[in-house]
Amino acid sequence: MERYFVHFKGGLYKLIAIASHSETLEEFAVYLALYGTGKVWIRPINMFFSKVNIRGVEVERFKEITKKEMLCLLKSQKEHI
């Protein structure tokens, strides 16, 4: 199942996999930027799904969105370039 997320700063991402560190077994989110050169990133899973405080309001660092929402946001971003 494809999973898409929007970062609290506005970037769009596709979650590629949940990976485990070979030594510590710590889990990481592996995700692809859906903008620019499409860089692949990793982040500890607990950080990926954490909340951040923006001017006193807690918001999800990465908010899960549907594929339809992702396509609408991508189209909107491309129109502003």
Model features per residue range: what roles?
Residues 1-81:
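Mixed-charge, low-complexity intrinsically disordered regions
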